Amino acid sequence: MPTAPLRITVIGSGVIGLSAAHELAAAGHQVTVAYDQELAECVSSVAAAIWFPYHSENSPAADKLLADSLARFEQLSEHPETGIDLRRGLNVDHLPGADRSWTRIVAGTEEASPADLPDGAHAGVWATVPIITMSTYLGWLRGRVEELGADFAKGTVTDLAQLKGGADLVVLAAGLRGGELLGDDDTVYPIRGQVVRLANTKNLTQWLCDDNYPDGVSYIIPRREDIIVGGTDTANDWNREVEPQTSIDILERAAKLVPELEGLEVLEHKVGLRPARETIRLEHVAGHPLPVIAAYGHGGAGVTLSWGTAQRVAELAAQLAGEPAS
């Protein structure tokens, strides 16, 4: 328990907001999660989701977030109700020069042999990483946050001043709206992602990713009952509508990489806007009606970075505990 529990409002109930709320409530703070989207509507629900630093910055600070998150997901995978499974798969490079820095964080990675690679692939690496079924995981995580005593308040926060008097600290995990709410950051932009969800009637378990594919990013992520097939990564594209031709292209690329996908039933087409920024913003921000911790700009790696981010948010809150609201 902190020496001076704070009243903390977390803005955002995606995977970053819920993870932060979990760590803050577990530390004994009085937490309220302010949200304007149901779990099924938020971009986190569109995530594949695989532990992989996709569109994430390459820095020592980010590496720590990655490692801390990986350790937590591995721990949680021991509990089936979380929706997390550790699965082996292949990260493929069709072009040379791919960033392999993430492999130093994952135990047991190994170089793929030429026989393992799809046609035209330059190289590949085998790894066992967490695969998260988000429809299960987000519900489980919200339930845990509620069990820890946090409250949830639906509504849109348009100005941080709205929260003065009702909170000692704000955690801003609002994704694309993060910079807008702070008013000092116009560097946040969307990276549009479109995916197709297939029925996993063939009980596939091995994942495959190629974020360096010449014809477009491709990934096949088998989960417990479905397979997420992607995708797109179009920067500054605000279109939230499904583009039918894009889905056709996604499935054609994926079938070349994993022929077993042929004939599987299409369950759903989904679009999400990843909240990107050149660097993750994870810091105490002064100069507002009350203290703010910014936690946004995770790009396509929100799930991958979520627990490390949450732990850092809790550390920053502990540093602020006992300080009066400005």
Curated annotation (Swiss-Prot):
- Give each disulfide bond as a residue pair: none
Cross-referenced InterPro entries, in alphabetical order?
DAO, FAD-dep_OxRdtase
The record's EC number reads 1.4.3.3
Keyword Cytoplasm recorded = yes
* Family membership: Belongs to the DAMOX/DASOX family.
Q: Where in the cell is it found?
A: Cytoplasm; Secreted, Cell wall
**Physiological role:** Catalyzes the oxidative deamination of D-amino acids with broad substrate specificity.
**EC class of the enzyme, as a word:** oxidoreductase
Query: What reaction gets catalysed by this protein?
Result: a D-alpha-amino acid + O2 + H2O = a 2-oxocarboxylate + H2O2 + NH4(+); D-phenylalanine + O2 + H2O = 3-phenylpyruvate + H2O2 + NH4(+); D-lysine + O2 + H2O = 6-amino-2-oxohexanoate + H2O2 + NH4(+); D-methionine + O2 + H2O = 4-methylsulfanyl-2-oxobutanoate + H2O2 + NH4(+)
Listed under subunit, the entry gives: Homodimer.
**Main location (coarse class):** cytoplasm
Residue spans crossing the bilayer: none
Q: Provide the coiled-coil residue spans.
A: none
Q: What Gene Ontology terms describe what this protein does at the molecular function level? A: D-amino-acid oxidase activity; FAD binding; glycine oxidase activity
Specify the protein name: D-amino-acid oxidase
Could you tell me which SUPFAM superfamilies the record lists for this protein?
FAD-linked reductases, C-terminal domain, Nucleotide-binding domain
**What Pfam families does this protein's entry cite?**
DAO
Q: Where does FAD bind?
A: 14-16, 36, 44, 48-50, 157, 274, 299-300, 302, 304
Cofactor names from the entry are:
FAD
Q: Which Gene3D superfamilies match?
A: D-Amino Acid Oxidase, subunit A, domain 2 (3.30.9.10), NAD(P)-binding Rossmann-like Domain (3.40.50.720)
Q: What does the UniProt keyword field contain?
A: Cell wall, Cytoplasm, FAD, Flavoprotein, Oxidoreductase, Secreted
pH-activity dependence text: Optimum pH is 6.5-9.2.
Q: Does the keyword Cytoplasm apply?
A: yes
